[in-house]
């Protein structure tokens, strides 16, 4: 038997209603906030991610699915979406029409991480990106948007963690202080952190090795080295969130795992899965568009981990039952199956969800199937004695039933179900 590759999985019909609930809520909220959807390829040139995410990161060094195509060019299954959205913004010169763009996208990403609870090698994200606005108020708005989305989904046990990573003006001062600290602790650091000390010291703060985390407890923080502009920016973000009633914690250890972040960085974390884990995160990346060959345009965005969010919701609220049909049509006797098919198809075309039987089963077994499908009504078309047995419409919840005319019952069914107001949304 052929099975899925390790770290990959199927999202089965019993799970997809929950995913659809999240996706619909996100799409509606994004559009309310003025975002437009963009759809992107799953494969990009490897250079895009090496230049944007950073060559000295776990993602680029250890986790990307990279391979040469037939012409020898290195291509990569996208490990995240922001770089692809930026590439599209530059390639299609969206900035020429209007530098301010608010875009969102949904889809699978790929990283060859160690599979564990809530983490897969193919995982799904919901991403939002804003280009062309440097104001701290848009930072606050994106965090507010996330807070509102989770509220609409019925999740309350979540905490926003904030930090500021500084800018090109003040980060070099922090890098020097951090490097000096790392040199004094290098005998306690793992080989990766010792290698990254000179190339990209900020990445050492993201190390998951317990010994490194212990050694880094007294490390310098970005907040202690902010320039006045970055400090004012972060102060405004915090004040705006507080004014809007959004709870948050300032987390000096939060650096995110991607090199392109600057100034505001944030995560939405939960303890619902046991250990503290992030269900969403993002931040500013004001230099990335220029770094990838575009104009100097400020930008900010976030990603929601759809797999992890769905797991949290399933654990806290359970998965919604799959939606049953409004009507299950039971054909009995010669010619009944054709009538049932025609009736079912017509009902589907006018927005009434209906199913029927194509296997010639008995009345008893088909009534059981109507119950199993959680059908709202059953329509019995008994053609065993067509001149005597009129169609019967039964409410599967109340068990009340009504006898219909001998002719095609479709119009009567539409009228009754519409007037009852029992059709499923």
Curated annotation (Swiss-Prot):
Similarity section: Belongs to the class-II aminoacyl-tRNA synthetase family.
Reactions performed catalytically: tRNA(His) + L-histidine + ATP = L-histidyl-tRNA(His) + AMP + diphosphate + H(+)
InterPro entries according to UniProt: aa-tRNA-synth_II, aa-tRNA-synth_II/BPL/LPL, Anticodon-bd, Anticodon-bd_dom_sf, His-tRNA-ligase, HisRS-like_core, HisRS/HisZ
The UniProt record lists the keyword ATP-binding: yes
Organism of provenance: Desulforapulum autotrophicum (strain ATCC 43914 / DSM 3382 / VKM B-1955 / HRM2)
Origin superkingdom: Bacteria
Compartments it resides in: Cytoplasm
A GO cellular-component term linked to this record: cytoplasm
Signal peptide: none
A biological process from GO: histidyl-tRNA aminoacylation
Subunit details: Homodimer.
Gene name linked to the record: hisS
UniProt keyword NAD present: no
Molecular function as annotated in GO: ATP binding; histidine-tRNA ligase activity
PROSITE patterns for the chain: AA_TRNA_LIGASE_II (PS50862)
Keywords annotated in UniProt: Aminoacyl-tRNA synthetase, ATP-binding, Cytoplasm, Ligase, Nucleotide-binding, Protein biosynthesis
Protein name, UniProt field: Histidine--tRNA ligase
Pfam families: HGTP_anticodon, tRNA-synt_His
Top-rank EC class of the record's enzyme: ligase
EC numbers on record: 6.1.1.21
Coiled-coil segments on the chain, per record: none
UniProt xrefs under SUPFAM superfamilies: Class II aaRS ABD-related, Class II aaRS and biotin synthetases
């Amino acid at each position: 038997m052929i099975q899925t590759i390790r770290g990959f999985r199927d999202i089965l019909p019993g799970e997809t209603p929950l995913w659809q609930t999240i996706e619909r809520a996100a799409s509606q909220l994004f559009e309310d906030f003025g975002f437009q959807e963009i759809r992107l390829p799953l494969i990009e040139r490897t250079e895009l991610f090496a230049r944007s995410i950073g060559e000295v990161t776990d993602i680029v060094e250890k986790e990307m699915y990279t391979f040469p195509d037939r012409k020898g060019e290195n291509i990569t299954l996208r490990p995240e979406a922001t770089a692809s959205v930026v590439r599209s913004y530059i390639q299609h010169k969206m900035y020429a029409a209007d530098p301010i763009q608010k875009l969102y996208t949904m889809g699978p990403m790929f990283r060859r991480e160690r599979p564990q609870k809530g983490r897969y090698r193919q995982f799904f994200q919901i991403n939002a990106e804003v280009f062309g606005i440097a104001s701290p108020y848009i930072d606050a708005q994106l965090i507010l948007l996330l807070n509102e989305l989770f509220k609409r989904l019925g999740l309350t046990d979540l905490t926003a963690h904030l930090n500021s990573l500084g800018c090109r003006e003040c980060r070099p001062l922090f890098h020097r202080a951090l490097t000096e600290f790392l040199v004094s602790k290098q005998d306690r650091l793992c080989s990766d952190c010792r290698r990254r000390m000179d190339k990209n010291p900020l990445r050492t703060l993201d190390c998951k090795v317990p010994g490194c985390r212990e050694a880094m407890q007294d490390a310098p923080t970005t907040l202690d080295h902010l320039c006045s502009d970055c400090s004012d920016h972060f102060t405004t973000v915090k004040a705006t969130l507080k004014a809007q009633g959004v709870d948050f914690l300032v987390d000096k250890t939060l650096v995110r795992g991607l090199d392109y972040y600057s100034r505001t960085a944030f995560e939405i974390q939960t303890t619902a899965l046991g250990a503290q884990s992030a269900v969403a995160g993002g931040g500013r990346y004001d230099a990335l568009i220029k770094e990838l060959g575009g104009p100097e345009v400020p930008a900010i965005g976030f990603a929601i981990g759809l797999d992890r969010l769905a797991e949290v919701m399933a654990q806290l609220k359970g998965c919604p039952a799959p939606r049953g049909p409004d009507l299950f049509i039971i054909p009995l006797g010669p010619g009944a199956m054709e009538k049932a098919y025609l009736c079912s198809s017509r009902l589907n075309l006018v927005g009434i969800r209906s199913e029927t039987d194509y296997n010639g089963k008995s009345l008893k077994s088909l009534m059981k199937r109507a119950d199993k499908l959680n059908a709202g009504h059953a329509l019995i078309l008994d053609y065993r004695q067509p001149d005597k047995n009129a169609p019967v419409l039964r409410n599967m919840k109340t068990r009340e039933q009504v006898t219909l005319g001998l002719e095609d019952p479709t119009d009567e069914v539409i009228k009754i179900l519409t007037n009852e107001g029992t059709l499923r949304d």
